[in-house]
């Protein structure tokens, strides 16, 4: 903190000769040290003044006797002093000059807003100096020039500006002139010298001893030396460093220059000397402090006293009171640490025993400036605030746990009734405002300005509270009152944008936006939205100024885009991150092989500066010694707290892998989130407990830990798993599903609280509650469902299932609230149906999509010719808002300039990442058609999938390689690329095609078939399991290819390896039957067969094995589940068939085995186009007979002739529709929400770094893509709750970067809190999506399904023969 000094010396100061001020003046960053033999000997060290008012002296007196002075000081508690007061106090008789403290001090002073100091304090403290009037004439005589105006030096002749000269005290001018030449010769600037002139003694010390300082502190910068020297007694602190720096650099502390400067700057000369004198005692037993802890304690006002108190009280507080050494250090590491520790010793038992606070909360209160006073105030006011005002102890602790906690508590006691009754705030809002540094002033300012800001400026009370609920809230509110009209009228910002800036960057950011917005927009090409994004963070002012300075350099010299510069700057610490990127980008790219995009990804987080520096230091170690890839290192670093996560991975990776059996990929997955450090440490501690005592698997523990807040989620699972399972009937897998998201802790606690209410009072099932909770923001979604479910159902006509569908996404809360608000408008004014509104809302970012539909639907329909159904189709995806806006912008260009049809544009836009796909089509369509020979339709086909952007870019890059080097045709490349995960599939084909063909004997067509259906994961699994399945299990390569050539091929192959012996040896199936089931119904069908054969369900008990196999091949698990649950209209159909069909032919049962053989033949055929003709020969069937067989199993003649069989679930839907047991499936854009269970694995992390591919996900991380021959394992009636929570980690998470929440089959999306800009799927997203059984993959067969004719009576009879003869179908035929 900058010291407060009167520019007019008091009589006491004038007495001091020559250099005495350096030794005598009280220092603001340490206790004052009077000269030996002075009249203050023996008195407590004087600290800076407090905001606590002191009584006025009885009468003004020009001087006190020594005795009366001592008496006065005894009444004055040094611990009450608060340096924040002094920062804002103007000097007596002179204009106030703003100080320029160091960054940390500036932040502290900015956050500690203090009351204006009472005059009586100044009188008492100033007058209370020892009487030294007699020596004054000697000083005046010795320095007559000081008082003579004629003697003042005109420093402008030395290059000082008028403003700089005004900052230099008149009496210091001659000293500045005397040392100017020497200081400039040492490299100090005029600004440096002006800052040093605050403490004139430092001018001479630095001028004379600079070379010695650099020798002792070789890394010290000019700013470091000025930062120490400008403090009171700064010259003595610099001289102390010269004396002891060498020894402090050595054992036991081994401090670096930065630490030494920090101690000298903040703790002063006494702290430097105390650290030197006590270094062995502090680091040795029993204290055993680390060097960092010693620096933390010493680097504060009163650091010397705090060190001495730690030596004395640390053993007592730890042994007698149960604190940890880290907690003691935390308390001591603030101004007033000594007093806080002593008060902690005295009040900890009282606050814990009498008031029920846990020790952690007491430590939190004490660990701030003014901790002593805060503890005493909590003891006094806790009962009053809780009993009389209804606050909870946690709220009282939250208010007290900040600088100025005492004053904030007292102000809450005084103003809570007023703010609630007169201004309509809630107690929670009052607590939120008070729970920051400067809470007192913020509360008082809210009381004063709330009416003005709401009535005159149109803000809401919530917005006023948001602005006030930060450090510096008072100043921010006052600045909003002053600048809101200017920023809105003159600069075009909205009130919401002004509120966003004020609620984060505060006063300084608002003023800087006013000043720099025109410059950044006009001269640098930024948009107002980008300027607002940069400003809306702590340090927004500095970030804006740095963008103005470095944007041209970073773009022109380093090749970054303005958007990347904005991304780096739009975080807390943006200034430092930008400067570090400028410094380290060349090093990280040239020496370490990172790409600029990866460097930007690392820098674009809180703590980006530190993360970049740590990557530079640890990348070689983590890659060479620990076997990580650069991509993995980047993934870990590209989160808030990346520095700490990297250091923890370096430390714990060997332990977690060797002692706990984790893989490096799992360690990386845990570390690659905000809070990765804490999550890794918690996994090390709790993994054995959760696995042994609670029965979780290692994979489940990793799933929980691999999210933001993983530490808290693990601890909550340990605590609540028994309760939720025993008392509430959840399964461990459901508990894991809830916990495996950002905010898992809060979601689990809310489920515990609301599950009984939602089930009993609102009629939800536990599965539905779990589905809602199993997303980011699950807590808020559950609470909103409790509040809005009755309203949405009764007033708006939605069903319970629709409300659950909307809520079961990240941002569910906001989506529900928006549906409540916009449903009437969209239906009445825009003609949408409630089902369409639900479809739009039932995705991540549903709120934004609904609002955009309301805004753009008329424009898109009237001006661009879209139908409402097409608008709904585009909006009904993650990123729907951005896709709609991009369609509005690019539709004319794509149609007029590039010749696309409106339907093609809609097809491209109607996927996750539609915005980016459209933009990429605009950019690459000419290149791909002209340079690579693709047709326009082929480009559209590639783009019309999730990840279309990345697939198009990969086709541009790899098409020549795959065709020229590997012999693929362009059509084959397009076929592989035209699926979700196309990018990764193409890259895997390039890598594995030679291996699979040369080493495993597959043909090129077979590799293409696997890649075009099962994708990257299926190709890798075939490489791994083909020898095992052929040699150990007797399958042929064609059969392995048939199983792999489906969505989920990886999981199907692994399940065949696991279950083939069981099904053949224990249950009597043949290998061919197992292959038929696996190649039609996949993993889920195989597991359903095993479950039925092991534990027969009554509904299927009457079926023979051949019947079961046929049913599984016919419709997979959905068919078996549907039969178990009872098929609608089946009894009526059976009666009708019984009446109309006479004697049944005896060959029908044989037909089922034949169906299985035919389906297996087609699935295993290496050339599907020839399968139909060869099947006629193979099975001795006529063309018509084979077509009829396929009709019975839901395949059209066109599909059969082409060998392209639809997924089993699609065939089953056709069968049910053709038989009349199920209504035609409504259009997803007009009737109901697309099945949520069908996308349960994909879009969990699309909200991160959405508009640019994230370098952290460029590794091998894709899943089996959802493909043209894909399957869905959903039940035919929609997503069953049971399916929504099946944990599938072992099959799906085979790559390190898959978002852990994808292991749970659940509704899609993860836009927590309603992201403003979800959009681009990055490589990992596309990779993981490939493990999903997405029903939309059946889109190529949709038209055929709609036209599939109804069964005739013979075909109905055949179907009824396949179904059970009794039970769920209710009769026989």
Swiss-Prot record:
<feature type="repeat" description="Core repeat 22">
    <location>
        <begin position="1002"/>
        <end position="1034"/>
    </location>
</feature>
<feature type="repeat" description="Core repeat 19">
    <location>
        <begin position="900"/>
        <end position="933"/>
    </location>
</feature>
<comment type="function">
    <text>Avirulence protein. Acts as a transcription factor in rice, inducing expression of a number of host genes including SWEET11 (Os8N3, XA13, AC Q6YZF3) in susceptible plants with the Xa13 allele. Plants with the xa13 allele, which has an altered promoter, are resistant to bacterial blight caused by this bacterial strain and do not induce SWEET11. The xa13 allele elicits an atypical hypersensitive response (HR). PthXo1 binds SWEET11 promoter DNA in a sequence-specific manner.</text>
</comment>
<feature type="repeat" description="Core repeat 13">
    <location>
        <begin position="696"/>
        <end position="729"/>
    </location>
</feature>
<keyword id="KW-0928">Hypersensitive response elicitation</keyword>
<keyword id="KW-0805">Transcription regulation</keyword>
<feature type="repeat" description="Cryptic repeat 0">
    <location>
        <begin position="256"/>
        <end position="273"/>
    </location>
</feature>
<feature type="repeat" description="HEAT 3">
    <location>
        <begin position="850"/>
        <end position="893"/>
    </location>
</feature>
<feature type="repeat" description="Core repeat 5">
    <location>
        <begin position="425"/>
        <end position="458"/>
    </location>
</feature>
<feature type="repeat" description="Core repeat 1">
    <location>
        <begin position="289"/>
        <end position="322"/>
    </location>
</feature>
<feature type="repeat" description="Core repeat 4">
    <location>
        <begin position="391"/>
        <end position="424"/>
    </location>
</feature>
<dbReference type="Pfam" id="PF03377">
    <property type="entry name" value="TAL_effector"/>
</dbReference>
<dbReference type="GO" id="GO:0005576">
    <property type="term" value="C:extracellular region"/>
</dbReference>
<feature type="short sequence motif" description="Nuclear localization signal NLS1">
    <location>
        <begin position="1222"/>
        <end position="1225"/>
    </location>
</feature>
<protein>
    <recommendedName>
        <fullName>TAL effector protein PthXo1</fullName>
    </recommendedName>
</protein>
<dbReference type="InterPro" id="IPR053450">
    <property type="entry name" value="TALE"/>
</dbReference>
<keyword id="KW-0964">Secreted</keyword>
<feature type="compositionally biased region" description="Low complexity">
    <location>
        <begin position="142"/>
        <end position="152"/>
    </location>
</feature>
<keyword id="KW-0804">Transcription</keyword>
<feature type="repeat" description="Core repeat 21">
    <location>
        <begin position="968"/>
        <end position="1001"/>
    </location>
</feature>
<feature type="repeat" description="Core repeat 2">
    <location>
        <begin position="323"/>
        <end position="356"/>
    </location>
</feature>
<feature type="repeat" description="HEAT 5">
    <location>
        <begin position="1053"/>
        <end position="1091"/>
    </location>
</feature>
<dbReference type="InterPro" id="IPR005042">
    <property type="entry name" value="TAL_effector_rpt"/>
</dbReference>
<feature type="repeat" description="Core repeat 8">
    <location>
        <begin position="526"/>
        <end position="559"/>
    </location>
</feature>
<keyword id="KW-1048">Host nucleus</keyword>
<feature type="region of interest" description="Acidic activation domain">
    <location>
        <begin position="1136"/>
        <end position="1364"/>
    </location>
</feature>
<keyword id="KW-0843">Virulence</keyword>
<feature type="region of interest" description="Disordered">
    <location>
        <begin position="1250"/>
        <end position="1286"/>
    </location>
</feature>
<feature type="repeat" description="Core repeat 15">
    <location>
        <begin position="764"/>
        <end position="797"/>
    </location>
</feature>
<feature type="repeat" description="Core repeat 17">
    <location>
        <begin position="832"/>
        <end position="865"/>
    </location>
</feature>
<feature type="repeat" description="Core repeat 10">
    <location>
        <begin position="594"/>
        <end position="627"/>
    </location>
</feature>
<feature type="repeat" description="Core repeat 18">
    <location>
        <begin position="866"/>
        <end position="899"/>
    </location>
</feature>
<feature type="compositionally biased region" description="Basic residues">
    <location>
        <begin position="131"/>
        <end position="141"/>
    </location>
</feature>
<feature type="repeat" description="Cryptic repeat -1">
    <location>
        <begin position="221"/>
        <end position="239"/>
    </location>
</feature>
<feature type="repeat" description="HEAT 2">
    <location>
        <begin position="782"/>
        <end position="828"/>
    </location>
</feature>
<feature type="repeat" description="Core repeat 14">
    <location>
        <begin position="730"/>
        <end position="763"/>
    </location>
</feature>
<feature type="repeat" description="Core repeat 7">
    <location>
        <begin position="493"/>
        <end position="525"/>
    </location>
</feature>
<feature type="repeat" description="Core repeat 3">
    <location>
        <begin position="357"/>
        <end position="390"/>
    </location>
</feature>
<dbReference type="GO" id="GO:0003677">
    <property type="term" value="F:DNA binding"/>
</dbReference>
<feature type="region of interest" description="Disordered">
    <location>
        <begin position="127"/>
        <end position="152"/>
    </location>
</feature>
<feature type="repeat" description="Core repeat 11">
    <location>
        <begin position="628"/>
        <end position="661"/>
    </location>
</feature>
<feature type="repeat" description="Core repeat 9">
    <location>
        <begin position="560"/>
        <end position="593"/>
    </location>
</feature>
């Amino acid at each position: 903190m900058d010291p407060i000094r009167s520019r007019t010396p008091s009589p006491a100061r004038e007495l001091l000769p020559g250099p005495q001020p350096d030794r005598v003046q009280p220092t603001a960053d340490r206790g004052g040290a009077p000269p030996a033999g002075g009249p203050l000997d023996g008195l407590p060290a004087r600290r800076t003044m407090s905001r606590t008012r002191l009584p006025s002296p009885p009468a003004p007196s020009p001087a006190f006797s020594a005795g009366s002075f001592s008496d006065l000081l005894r009444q004055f508690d040094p611990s009450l002093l608060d340096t924040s007061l002094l920062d804002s106090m103007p000097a007596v008789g002179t204009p106030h000059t703003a100080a320029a403290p160091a960054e940390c001090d500036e932040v502290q002073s900015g956050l500690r807003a203090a009351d204006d100091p009472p005059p009586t304090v100044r009188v008492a403290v100033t007058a209370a100096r020892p009487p030294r009037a007699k020596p004054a004439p000697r000083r005046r005589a010795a320095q007559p020039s000081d008082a003579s105006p004629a003697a003042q030096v005109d420093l402008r002749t030395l290059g000082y500006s008028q403003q700089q000269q005004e900052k230099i005290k008149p009496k210091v001018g001659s000293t500045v002139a005397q040392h100017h030449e020497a200081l400039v010769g040492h490299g100090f600037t005029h600004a440096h010298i002006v800052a040093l002139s605050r403490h004139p003694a430092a001018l001479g010390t630095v001028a004379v001893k600079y070379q010695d300082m650099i020798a002792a502190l070789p890394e010290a910068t000019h700013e470091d030396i000025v930062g120490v020297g400008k403090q009171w007694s700064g010259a003595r602190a610099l001289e102390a460093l010269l004396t002891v720096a060498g020894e402090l650099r050595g054992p036991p502390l081994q401090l670096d220059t930065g630490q030494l400067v920090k101690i000298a700057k903040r703790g002063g000369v006494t702290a430097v000397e105390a650290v030197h004198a006590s270094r062995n005692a502090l680091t040795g037993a029993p204290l055993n402090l680390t060097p960092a802890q010693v620096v933390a304690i010493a680097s504060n006002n009163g650091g010397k006293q705090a060190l001495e108190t730690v030596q004395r009280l640390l053993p007592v507080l730890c042994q007698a009171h149960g604190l940890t050494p880290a907690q003691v250090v935390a308390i001591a590491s603030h101004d007033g640490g000594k007093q806080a520790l002593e008060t902690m010793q005295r009040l900890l038992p009282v606050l814990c025993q009498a008031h029920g606070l846990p020790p952690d909360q007491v430590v939190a209160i004490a660990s701030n400036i003014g901790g002593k006073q805060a503890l005493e105030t909590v003891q006094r006011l806790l009962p009053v605030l809780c009993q009389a005002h209804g606050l909870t102890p946690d709220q009282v602790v939250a208010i007290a746990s900040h600088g100025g906690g005492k004053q904030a508590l007292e102000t809450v006691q005084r103003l809570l009734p007023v703010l609630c009754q007169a201004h309509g705030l809630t107690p929670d809002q009052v607590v939120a405002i008070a729970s920051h540094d400067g809470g007192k002033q913020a509360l008082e300012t809210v009381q004063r300005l709330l009416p003005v800001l709401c009535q005159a400026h149109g803000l809401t009370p919530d917005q006023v509270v948001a602005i006030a609920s930060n450090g510096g809230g008072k100043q921010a509110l006052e600045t909003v009152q002053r600048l809101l009209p200017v920023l809105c009228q003159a600069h075009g910002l909205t009130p919401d944008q002004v509120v966003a800036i004020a609620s984060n960057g505060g006063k300084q950011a608002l003023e800087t936006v006013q000043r720099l917005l025109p410059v950044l927009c006009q001269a640098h090409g930024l948009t107002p939205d980008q300027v607002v994004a940069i400003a809306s963070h702590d340090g927004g002012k500095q970030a804006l100024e740095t963008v103005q300075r470095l944007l041209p350099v970073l773009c022109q010299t380093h090749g970054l885009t303005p958007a990347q510069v904005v991304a780096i700057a739009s975080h807390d610490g943006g200034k430092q991150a930008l400067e570090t990127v400028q410094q380290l980008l060349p090093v990280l790219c040239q020496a370490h092989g990172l790409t600029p995009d990866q460097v930007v990804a690392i820098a674009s987080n809180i703590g980006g500066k530190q993360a970049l520096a740590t990557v530079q230091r640890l990348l070689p170690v983590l890659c060479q010694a620990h076997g990580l890839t650069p991509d993995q290192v980047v993934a870990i670093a590209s989160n808030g707290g990346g520095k700490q996560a990297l250091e923890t991975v370096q430390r714990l990776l060997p332990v977690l892998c060797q002692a706990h059996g984790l893989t490096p990929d799992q360690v990386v997955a845990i570390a690659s989130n905000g809070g990765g450090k804490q999550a890794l440490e918690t996994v090390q501690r709790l993994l054995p407990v959760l696995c042994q005592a609670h029965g979780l698997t290692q994979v489940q523990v990793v799933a929980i830990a691999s999210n933001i807040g993983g530490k808290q989620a693990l601890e909550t699972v340990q605590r609540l798993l028994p309760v939720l399972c025993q008392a509430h009937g959840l399964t461990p897998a459901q508990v894991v599903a809830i916990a495996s998201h950002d905010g898992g802790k809060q979601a689990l606690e809310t489920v515990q609280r609301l599950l009984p209410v939602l089930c009993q009072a609102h009629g939800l099932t536990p599965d539905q509650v779990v589905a809602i909770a199993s997303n980011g923001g699950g807590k808020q979604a559950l609470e909103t469902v409790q509040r809005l479910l009755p309203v949405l159902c009764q007033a708006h006509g939605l069903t319970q299932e629709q409300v659950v569908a909307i809520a079961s996404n990240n941002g569910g809360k906001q989506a529900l609230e928006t549906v409540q608000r916009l449903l009437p408008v969209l239906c009445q004014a825009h003609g949408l149906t409630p089902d369409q509104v639900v479809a739009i809302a039932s995705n991540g970012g549903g709120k934004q999509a609904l609002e955009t539909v309301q805004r753009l639907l008329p424009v898109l329909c009237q001006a661009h010719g879209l139908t409402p159904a097409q608008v709904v189709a585009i909006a009904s995806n993650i990123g729907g808002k951005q896709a709609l806006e991009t369609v509005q912008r690019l539709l004319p260009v794509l149609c007029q300039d590039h010749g696309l049809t409106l339907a093609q544009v809609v097809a491209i836009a109607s996927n996750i990442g539609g915005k980016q796909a459209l933009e990429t089509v605009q950019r690459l369509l000419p290149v791909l058609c002209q340079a690579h020979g693709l047709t326009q339709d082929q480009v559209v086909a590639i783009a019309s999938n999730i990840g279309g952007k990345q697939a198009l870019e990969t086709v541009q890059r790899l098409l020549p390689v795959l065709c020229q080097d590997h012999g693929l045709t362009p059509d084959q490349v397009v076929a592989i690329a035209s699926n979700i995960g196309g990018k990764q599939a193409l890259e895997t084909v390039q890598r594995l095609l030679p291996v699979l063909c040369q080493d495993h004997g597959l043909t090129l067509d077979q590799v293409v078939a696997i890649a075009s259906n099962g994708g990257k994961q299926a190709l890798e699994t075939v490489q791994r399991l083909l020898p095992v399945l052929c040699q150990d299990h007797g399958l042929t390569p064609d059969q392995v290819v048939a199983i792999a050539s489906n969505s989920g091929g990886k999981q199907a192959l692994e399940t065949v390896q696991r279950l083939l012996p069981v099904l053949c040896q224990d249950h009597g199936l043949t290998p061919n039957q197992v292959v038929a089931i696996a190649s039609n119904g996949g993993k889920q069908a195989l597991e359903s067969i095993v479950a039925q054969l092991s534990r027969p369900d009554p509904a299927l008990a009457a079926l023979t094995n051949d019947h079961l196999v046929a049913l599984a091949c016919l419709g997979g698990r959905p068919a078996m589940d549907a039969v178990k649950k009872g098929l609608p209209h089946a009894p009526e159909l059976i009666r009708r068939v019984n009446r109309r069909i006479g004697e049944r032919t005896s060959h029908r049962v044989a037909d089922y085995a034949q169906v299985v053989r035919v389906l297996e033949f087609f699935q295993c055929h290496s050339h599907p186009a020839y399968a139909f003709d060869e099947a006629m020969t193979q099975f001795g069937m006529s063309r018509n007979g084979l077509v009829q067989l396929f009709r019975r199993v839901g395949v059209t003649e066109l599909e059969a002739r082409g060998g392209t069989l639809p997924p089993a679930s699609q065939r089953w839907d056709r069968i049910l529709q053709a038989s009349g047991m199920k209504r035609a499936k409504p259009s997803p854009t007009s009737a109901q929400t697309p099945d949520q269970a069908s996308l349960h694995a994909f879009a969990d992390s699309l909200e991160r770094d959405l508009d640019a591919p994230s370098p952290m996900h460029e590794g091998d991380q894709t899943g089996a893509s959802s493909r043209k021959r894909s399957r869905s394992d959903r039940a035919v009636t929609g997503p069953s709750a049971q399916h929504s929570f099946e944990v599938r980690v072992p099959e799906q998470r085979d790559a390190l970067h898959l978002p852990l929440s994808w292991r749970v089959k659940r509704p899609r999306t993860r836009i927590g809190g309603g992201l403003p800009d979800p959009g681009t799927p990055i490589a990992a997203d596309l990779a993981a999506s490939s493990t999903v059984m997405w029903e939309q993959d059946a889109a190529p067969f949709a038209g055929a399904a709609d036209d599939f004719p109804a069964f005739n009576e013979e075909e109905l009879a055949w179907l009824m023969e396949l179904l059970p003869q009794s039970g769920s179908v209710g009769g026989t035929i």
